[in-house]
Amino acid sequence: PKEEHKTRDIWTAEVLQKALEACDDDILRLAINLAFSCSLRMGELLGLTWDCIDISPTSIELGQASIFVEKELQRVNREAMADLDGKDIMFKFPPTFASTHTALVLKTPKTKTSVRKVFLPKTVAEMLVQRKADIEELKDLFGDEFVDFNLVFCSSNGKPIEGQVINRA
C-alpha cells in the first residue's frame, strides 16, 4: 500500500519573521534564510559546498551572487548503497562509529530538475561571506583537528551537520 505523507504547514511571512527574530544562532539563521530565499530542501541545504557558491565581491555588487544546487546530504543504508554500486554517490563521509548500518553521503538529487542555479539576495550573500570567515577562524583554532569537507553547514570541527540537529534547534 502507498504510504500517506503528512502535509506540512507552510510558514507565512509573519511566522518566518518571528522565527528569525527569535533565532539567536547565526548558523540556524543562515539556514533559515537560505531555505526560504532559495527554496532549498534540508538535504540540499546541508550538502551545500563552497565550490558551488559564488559570493565574490563583484558578484554581490552586481546582484549576481548565486549557489549551484547539485548535491544533497543524506544518510543511506550501507546495503542499499552497495546495491547501487556507488551510483549517484558523489562522496561518502568517514563513519563516526564503526558499527553503523548507515553511511552519510553527498549524492546527486533524485531528479534532474533539482539541479539548478539560484541567485542570492544580497543580505543572504553577505551572511555567507561571514560564514566563510567564521569557518576560516575555526580552521585556525582547531588546526589539524578540523576536517575540511568544504561544507557550508558543518560542526565546529568541520564534520557534517545532519538534519535532525537543525530540526531540534
Placement of each model-derived feature along the sequence:
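Phosphate- and divalent-cation-binding pockets in alpha/beta enzyme and binding domains
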Residues: 44, 127, 169
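Residue-level detector of conserved, well-ordered beta-strand and adjacent loop positions
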Residues: 8, 12, 20, 70, ...
